[in-house]
Amino acid sequence: MRTRTLILLVLLVILAFLGNAWLIPTIVCAADYTGRVVGVIDGDTLEVLNGHHAERIRLSGIDCPEKGQAYGQKAKHAASDLAFGKEVTVQTHGLDKYKRTLGDVLLPDGMNLNQELVKQGWCWWYRKYAPGDTVLEGLEKDAREAKIGLWVDPAPITPWVFRKARRGQSLER
């Protein structure tokens, strides 16, 4: 009888755990939310209040110049001018390799921050991670042709090439 009770108890514990297993992805990949932008780390990384904690958001589909790179500070200022202190909606798309939330940030007027930074010429459409995004592709093309933002430079160095060079790897555009 004791063995039977013990087996039943173990099975109940396992079932209780499995019954809540569907909650795990929710914890790992948060749902969309609204919060105030409390920090701008660089052109493509923000901190947004999610409840009582600041969550680091990596803007998906774009790549801005690095802090120490040409146009890096201008990209950061553009993101700050557009979003800092504002109540935004974060549309989450999972986590990146640094455990930052990937997402699109919608400004109070409905404007997509990711797209606006590309439109203003402060970043690249990140083809590697958003290969089918024809909106970002078109916005980058328009900014290049208009020679606005970093596109005033006839041959700007992409952030991924800049990062490689900083690590001592060969510089290829």
Task: Give the ranges of each region predicted by the language model.
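Small beta-barrel nucleic-acid-binding modules, primarily SNase/OB-fold domains
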Residues: 2-173
